[in-house]
């Protein structure tokens, strides 16, 4: 049980961060008609939709959004709690696309590695980039986000909790010490 809960991002700060991240994606992408966002279950999916909405508001272009479940692609299945896999929803070919994988928090990099393996089953994108709301460090794999909302150095025993309106009824990021 955590001794202390510290707010890292408020709802307003999350909104501003998503606007900044959307602008960075637009800047780096070039041809937005080739852009697709793929959220990693669970909170990467609503985050991808929020990001797509921001891009649409800024550029007046609809961005395709998919969702990927990495449960069966993980290399640490024996260490995580048993869970029922969510359904991957990528109703479009990824060949030649600019794919931005979206997740709420990056920690050791294992979820992203699994997502990279899963995504390539849906085509061969021209480029795959990674966007995270919070980067807490402690990587075990050479995986680094292209877009980061907030870098948050943490101790390994601490937890970062992301709450998003569509899933949790509120927007907030907390550090549990």
From Swiss-Prot:
It is an enzyme of class 2 (transferase). Keywords: Glycosyltransferase, Transcription, Transcription regulation, Transferase. It holds the Pfam family Pribosyltran. It catalyses: UMP + diphosphate = 5-phospho-alpha-D-ribose 1-diphosphate + uracil. One of its GO terms (molecular function) is uracil phosphoribosyltransferase activity. A motif (PRPP-binding) lies at residues 99-111. Its EC number is 2.4.2.9. One of its GO terms (biological process) is regulation of DNA-templated transcription. InterPro entries: PRibTrfase_dom, PRTase-like, PyrR, PyrR_bifunctional. CDD domains: PRTases_typeI (cd06223). Belongs to the purine/pyrimidine phosphoribosyltransferase family. PyrR subfamily. NCBIfam families: PRK05205.1-5. This is Bifunctional protein PyrR. It comes from Gloeothece citriformis (strain PCC 7424).
């Amino acid at each position: 049980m955590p001794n202390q809960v510290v707010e890292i991002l408020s709802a307003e700060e999350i909104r501003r961060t998503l606007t900044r991240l959307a602008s960075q994606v637009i800047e780096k992408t070039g041809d937005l008609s080739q852009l697709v966002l793929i959220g990693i279950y669970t909170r990467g999916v609503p985050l991808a939709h929020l990001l797509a909405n921001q891009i649409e508001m800024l550029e007046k272009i609809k961005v395709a959004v998919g969702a990927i479940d990495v449960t069966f692609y993980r290399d640490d299945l024996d260490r995580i709690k048993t869970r029922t896999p969510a359904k991957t929803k990528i109703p479009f070919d990824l060949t030649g696309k600019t794919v931005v994988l979206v997740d709420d928090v990056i920690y050791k990099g294992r979820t992203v590695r699994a997502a990279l393996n899963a995504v390539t089953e849906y085509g061969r994108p021209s480029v795959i980039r990674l966007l995270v709301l919070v980067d807490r460090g402690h990587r075990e794999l050479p995986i680094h986000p292209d877009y980061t909302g907030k870098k948050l150095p943490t101790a390994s025993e601490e937890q970062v909790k992301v709450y998003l309106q569509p899933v949790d009824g509120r927007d907030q990021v907390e550090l549990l010490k």
